[in-house]
Amino acid sequence: MINIIECDDYEVAKNLVLDYSKIKGAEACFVSLDKELSDLEGFYKGGALLLGYENEKPIATIAIKKINDDMAEAKRLYIKPEYRGKGYARHMLDAMLDKCRELKYKEVRFTTKPEVMSIGYALYKKIGFEELENNDGTVLMRMMLTL
């Protein structure tokens, strides 16, 4: 079972994001990685950084970045490979959406690369994210939230 909490250890979060950044083909998702990692707390101010634990071991992350008072961007959904296939990504997404509602966001956006992250892309569509645009294989998706 996964236990999801707001980040209380930025070094743990940094290591998970670094693991995620090594996924082959996902390099374009990390253009501002150095800036992000140098101040995770500041980078996600007005949003949140959530960590997922199994048996007290950090295994997952997802972040919420404030765009404006009504809109946030979900970022950095990552489950360590050995923990995939257990439904944890869905739990992380649900926790992220709950936190967005708590923060009073009306819209959440997500950018993904379906050819690299096909399972995640299918899950986003399954839970209600809609595709807004596709630029050379990078897809912008959104979900409108009810508070």
Where are these regions (language model features)?
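Acetyl-CoA-dependent GNAT
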Residues: 4-75, 80, 93-94, 99, ...
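Surface-exposed, flexible loop/turn segments at secondary-structure boundaries
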Residues: 69-70, 85, 116, 137
